[in-house]
Amino acid sequence: MIAITHPIKQMINSQYGFLSSMLDRFPSLLNEWIKKQEEEVEQLAREYAEGDYEVYRDTYNSEISRVDSCYDEELLFNQAMLIMVYSYYESTLLRLSKEVQVDSPRPSLIANKFNATLDDELIRISEFVFNKVEPLRDQLCHNNSGTLFEKNKERAEASINFLLQKKYISVYEGRITSINRDFIKKVLDGEHKLLLKLAEICGYKTILYGYKDGLDSMVPLKSW
């Protein structure tokens, strides 16, 4: 027996797996690197001080500042991940809409093409990404220089304030400074679930082929 997955469904799963792995692995990799750097700084300070505590302290404090700046990289990483997670969703919807020839890459329109409807959970995911995640992405990409809400003010302000209240993001002096990693993962998981359902509605499935009694060639046995 052999299982063959439609290329679009395979793309949805492989890109999800890649993004999910990045989210899961980066914090531990960063912490390992920071720990190693801290150990090297301490060793350097001890060697340079030769027993003089004040020299050790000054050297350590001077060198450790470059390690502390690495925590800023995690903030930038999470911002970049949010942008990539949204792009994964947006580009896949565009691909699906072109494949099935609908005018707009909206999940409901893609489903309606096949006389199908999305359940309440998937509708909520679609609306959340459109109403909350997309404005956040737009702010990060186009307007995160201390002038929050300047573009598309009404929608952006409502969305950002909602995310602030939920503690999904932090804002300082008009700039989005941090995004909760668990929030990004939750968005990614929801997008993946919705995209897989749309792929199923479009007929993009995994098909299991195998032999049946009396047949010399493989035939479809089941799909999912």
Label each PLM-derived region with a short phrase.
Residues 76-185, 218-222:
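Flexible secondary-structure boundary motifs
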Residues 1-79, 152-224:
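Extended intrinsically disordered or low-complexity regions, especially N/C-terminal cytosolic tails and loops
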